[in-house]
Amino acid sequence: THWTAEERHYITSMWDKINVAEIGGESLARMLIVYPWTQKFFSDFGNLTSSSAIMHNVKIQEHGKKVLNSFGSAVKNMDHIKETFADLSKLHCETLHVDPENFKLLGSILIIVLAMHFGKEPTPTWQAAWQKLVSAVAHALTLQYH
C-alpha cells in the first residue's frame, strides 16, 4: 500500500490522541453488539447476554485494548503491514478459525467509534485515510486464509 504524506499525517496525528483502552474496548464491544454472530469467538469471555453486559465486560474491554494495541503496529509500520500481521493472520486462521470478514467489520466499527470520540475532526479526507488503513490491516490478517 502506498501512503501519501497527508494520509500518514491523518493517521499518526489521530493515533497519538487515542486512548487505546477506551477506544479498543468500545470498538470490540460494539462489534459484538452490532454483529452478534461474532460473539461465538468470545464464548469464554463471560456474560455477553445484553448490550450493557458486553459494554461492561472486563475481558472484552481488555481484549479490545489488546486488539487496538496490535493495530498500533500498523500505524508504526505502515509500509510493512503484511509482514507486521503475518503471525496474527496465522493465529486467527489456523488456531482461532475467525471469519476473515470480521476484520473488516471491526475496522468499520473502529472508524465509527473514532468519529464519535473526536467530533468534527474526522473529515471525509481523514475517513478515507483511516478506511485505507483498516482495509490494509484487514487484508493483511486474511493472507493466511485459503
UniProtKB/Swiss-Prot annotation:
All residue ranges annotated as the Globin domain in the record: 2-146
GO-annotated cellular components: blood microparticle; haptoglobin-hemoglobin complex; hemoglobin complex
Pfam family, one: Globin
Entry's Gene Ontology molecular function annotations: haptoglobin binding; heme binding; metal ion binding; organic acid binding; oxygen binding; oxygen carrier activity; peroxidase activity
Entry keyword annotation includes Heme: yes
Role of this protein: Involved in oxygen transport from the lung to the various peripheral tissues.
Protein name per UniProt: Hemoglobin subunit beta
Organism annotation: Caretta caretta
